[in-house]
């Protein structure tokens, strides 16, 4: 293989879910991948979100589609839209997480059955469903990435319900890596350090969480949106063809300090 192609995304076709605004991890990934020559279909939640997202995606040539993963048929519809547009998919990035605020801000033991189930459905099961929907349209193999966080494997104050939900997501990633490996589809969880996104703003005392992370980080700073996108782009390249089933940290080294 030409070594130049190993680190290229030119001509690759991708689906990226979860843009809320220009601070979203999903947007950072979509922007970088477009700059690197990939073609991208991306999602925002609904028409209300589109007003904030489209001014940033349209100039980049990103095809923006509404997708509420809780709404029957919408996840399947966006996959079909991308496949009809591109003919195939080479990479898929899932950057969606949600829980009802009452459950997110309370203790895990107090989480409602419905709130817990919805958090898992939106944040975790939707990635497994993406695997089912996208794998048949990835004839050349490729990569599927989901976004997670350190609080999946250790207790992070105020992260609450999302901790066990992200732990479930990371387990799904590992099982999907086995189930899709025969199709040459690589599956990873990317674990960024805290950055101020719309989703993160729902976490109680998030400013305190960021300050703690910065104080612990060997690099003595927080990770940047572009750095999360850079790791994600690499994992979608042929250069990462020997890797699958991992949770990979991009957090300025915070994970190594515990």
How should these model regions be labeled?
Residues 2-118, 202:
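Short-chain dehydrogenase/reductase
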Residues 186-196, 236, 249-251:
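Conserved SDR Rossmann-fold cofactor-binding beta-strand/turn motif
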Residues 244-258:
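Short C-terminal tail/terminal secondary-structure segment
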Residues 181, 186, 243-245:
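Short, small/polar-rich loop/turn modules that mediate ligand/substrate recognition or access, typified
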Residues 217-228, 239:
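A conserved structural motif in NAD(P)-dependent oxidoreductases
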Residues 54, 182, 192-217, 227, ...:
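A glycine/serine/threonine-rich, flexible loop-to-helix segment
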């Amino acid at each position: 293989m030409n070594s130049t192609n190993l680190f290229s995304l030119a001509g690759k076709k991708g689906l990226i879910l979860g843009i809320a605004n220009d601070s979203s991890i999903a947007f950072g990934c979509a922007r970088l991948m477009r700059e690197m020559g990939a073609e991208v279909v991306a999602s925002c939640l609904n028409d209300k979100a589109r007003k904030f997202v489209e001014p940033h995606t349209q100039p980049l040539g990103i095809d923006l589609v509404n997708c509420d993963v809780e709404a029957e048929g919408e996840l399947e519809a966006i996959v079909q839209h991308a496949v009809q547009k591109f003919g195939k998919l080479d990479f898929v990035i899932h950057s969606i997480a949600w829980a009802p605020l009452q459950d997110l801000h309370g203790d895990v033991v107090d989480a409602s059955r419905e709130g817990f189930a919805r958090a898992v459905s939106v944040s975790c099961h939707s990635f497994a469903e993406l695997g089912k929907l996208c794998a048949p349209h990835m004839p050349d193999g490729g990569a599927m990435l989901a976004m997670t966080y350190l609080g999946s494997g250790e207790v992070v104050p105020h992260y609450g319900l999302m901790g066990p939900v992200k732990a479930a997501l990371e387990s799904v990633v590992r099982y999907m890596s086995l189930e899709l490996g025969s199709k040459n589809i690589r599956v990873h969880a990317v674990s960024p350090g805290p950055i101020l996104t719309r989703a993160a703003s729902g976490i109680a005392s998030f400013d305190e969480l960021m300050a703690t992370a910065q104080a612990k980080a060997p690099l003595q700073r927080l990770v940047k949106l572009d750095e999360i996108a850079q790791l994600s782009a690499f994992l979608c390249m042929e250069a990462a063809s020997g890797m699958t089933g991992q949770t990979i940290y991009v957090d300025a080294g915070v994970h190594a300090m515990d």
